[in-house]
């Protein structure tokens, strides 16, 4: 009897040890630390980057900042490991998840929400049901049904329903974005967060991703299409940007089709704003009058209160920025733009001080006098 008990105990112990090892292996397999480089090695000036910290500390609610150049971290500020809510950055990540399923035909962008059986608590008008999946992911559906979560259309700027034809007007509308999430699950059969884990987090080697933190959220009495909030650390946000910079390729694997990366970061809705030249497929497209060459082709995921993932193809650079929920204050879009300019300035060649002018040689008075006398003698 004792022998049997010992045998059973040994068997159970082996099973438990195996499970623990498997769990540890999965965690290690997920974690893939970033390589690090000195700013000078990639042509950036370290002293100028330090101005970012000075500005952020004195003026913003920045809690984490990562600057990646040529695939290596060259500068960090704050706690880059802290995982927190990333607000509307979720929409750009959803665009990335859409990529392969659009390219392989699983998701058809010309399908209408009526054909997909999409409806909502207040009911959708026949005209609204003509909006396509493409309209949803470009914020041009013309459907102004209340969203399950705040954000998007300002409270003081309501649009009349049934007036705007789909595809004709850009309105940043959370209803569109949330329904795009519903469509993703409906067409792929995948939970958004499971897809996030298997298609992005694991292959990217995210260091801080936690599937358990991710749950749909919103007021189902307002709309049955809930928001797919996402939570990342700043250093893992940088991985998302780096994947886009690399045209969707990571460690030899094409995680997001290159054609989708190009398409989603091209202008769909032109915008005449100081910092935005347009909106693509769930990505903001940037410009800057002060540094037009450095900002050429730049685009960004942007979330309320200071959540940003910005890609600079011209500089082979990614900037990830966060103002976490515990920040005493938030970071405005204007403040973030100033941070980006400080980083760009650090990439500019160091100006050489002008060469000192040769001092004019003043002749000695004794030397001048005889010459003057000679001249007078003539």
What is the predicted role of each segment?
Residues 35-37, 47-51, 99-172:
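Active-site-proximal loop and beta-strand segments within enzyme catalytic domains
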Residues 49-80, 309-310, 316-320:
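A short, well-structured edge-of-sheet supersecondary motif
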Residues 71, 85-110, 136, 180-184, ...:
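Active-site SXXK
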Residues 103-139, 188-227:
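Active-site helix/loop module of the DD-peptidase/beta-lactamase fold
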Residues 179-183, 228-250, 307-323:
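Active-site-proximal alpha-helical segments within enzyme catalytic domains
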Residues 208, 266-318:
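Active-site Gly/Thr loop motif
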Residues 301-378:
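Structured C-terminal helix/loop/strand segments within mature extracytoplasmic catalytic/sensor domains
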């Amino acid at each position: 009897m004792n022998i049997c008990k010992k045998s059973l105990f040994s068997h159970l112990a082996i099973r438990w040890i195996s499970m623990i090892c498997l769990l540890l292996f999965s965690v290690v397999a997920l974690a893939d630390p970033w390589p690090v480089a000195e700013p000078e090695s990639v042509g950036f000036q370290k002293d100028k980057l330090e101005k970012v910290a000075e500005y952020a500390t004195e003026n913003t609610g920045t809690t984490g900042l990562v600057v990646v150049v040529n695939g290596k971290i060259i500068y960090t500020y704050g706690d880059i490991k802290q995982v927190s809510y990333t607000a509307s950055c979720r929409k750009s990540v959803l665009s990335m998840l859409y990529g392969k399923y659009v390219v392989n035909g699983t998701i058809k962008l010309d399908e209408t929400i009526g054909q997909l059986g999409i409806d909502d608590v207040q009911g959708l008008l026949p005209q609204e049901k003509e909006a396509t999946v493409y309209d949803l992911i470009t914020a041009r559906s013309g459907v102004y049904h209340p969203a399950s979560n705040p954000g998007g259309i300002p409270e003081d700027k309501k649009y009349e329903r049934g007036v705007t034809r789909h595809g004709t007007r850009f309105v940043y509308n959370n209803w569109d974005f949330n329904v795009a999430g519903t469509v993703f699950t409906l067409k792929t059969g995948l939970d958004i967060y499971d897809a996030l884990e298997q298609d992005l987090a694991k292959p990217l080697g995210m260091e801080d991703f936690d599937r358990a933190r991710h749950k749909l959220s919103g007021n189902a009495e307002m709309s049955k299409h809930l928001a797919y909030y996402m939570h990342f650390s700043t250093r893992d946000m940088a991985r998302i940007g780096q994947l886009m910079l690399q045209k969707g390729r990571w460690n030899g694997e094409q995680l997001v089709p290159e054609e989708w990366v190009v398409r989603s970061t091209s202008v769909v809705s032109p915008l005449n704003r100081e910092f935005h030249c347009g909106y693509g497929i769930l990505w903001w497209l940037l410009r800057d009058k002060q540094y037009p060459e450095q900002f050429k082709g730049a685009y960004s995921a942007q979330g309320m209160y200071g959540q940003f993932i910005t890609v600079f193809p011209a500089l082979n650079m990614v900037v990830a920025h966060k103002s976490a929920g515990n920040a005493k204050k938030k970071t405005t879009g204007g403040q973030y733009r100033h941070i980006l300019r400080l980083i760009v300035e650090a990439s500019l060649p160091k100006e050489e001080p002008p060469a000192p002018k040769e001092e004019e040689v003043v002749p000695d008075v004794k030397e001048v006098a005889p010459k003057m006398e000679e001249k007078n003698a003539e």
